[in-house]
């Protein structure tokens, strides 16, 4: 429920009751919708539009890669209200999927994390009240980035879990599988891989803990934790891919089979390097912060 991070505390109690309560209690599913077919990391190029008419906005456009899109009752939607301002023209809205003009489109056939449904969402003259706007016009990108800061810590934790599962499976297999008259774990080629896997896992864990602590401190200080979150997400996601790849290799032929779960860990790990900002975007964020650039 990372989407709850995008809900400003100053919103009315009626809106909180309508949107926050059912999602926070698990009675409803929420979603976060920023990406479009032609707009990923470069959010300022999004083509969806929200045109204001009095106290109502008319929304048209297509959003893609919406996690829980096929089942979500509510969405936090980011769309363009002033295209000339690029990312400073993005505005956020709370969306009720039951209203006319909300269309669930194709479900994505994904490489991994198949238990999580992902789809496109179409908006066809969808009407939303000004009361359901999050923040002011043009504040959407700022809200989206704040949500991503928190979300990247969660993705780091997800990546860590995948890496740990792949590592544990590899250790167990190395203890049991025999080749050339001995356990394969006795071979340095395997043992050294396991050592590297374990070391990276523990380093990733500490970066995630550090980011989580920075997030907690921000509640008192108001400071952003973008740097810590990006470092944790970058390292943990690349660790997940490194460990999952090594796990398949250690298992050999059976690692390529669906008889064992390591092939799933390999498929599931890849998305952690992509969503919530690719590894390249994380490196860009980290380097710009360290260099004092915007």
Task: Name each model-derived stretch.
Residues 45, 98-129:
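Flexible, small-/acidic-enriched active-site or ligand-binding loops
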Residues 31, 47-49, 56, 74-78, ...:
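Conserved hydrophobic/aromatic beta-strand scaffold that supports enzyme active sites
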Residues 26-34:
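A short, Trp-centered hydrophobic/proline-enriched beta-strand micro-motif
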Residues 11, 15, 22, 26, ...:
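Alpha-helical interface subdomain recognition
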Residues 56, 60-104:
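A short core secondary-structure module
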Residues 23, 38-41, 65-68, 82-84, ...:
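Short Gly/Pro-enriched turn/cap motifs at secondary-structure boundaries
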Residues 41, 132-137:
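Cytochrome P450 core scaffold surrounding the K-helix E-X-X-R motif
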Residues 1-12:
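Short, small-residue-biased leader/transition segments that mark boundaries at the very start
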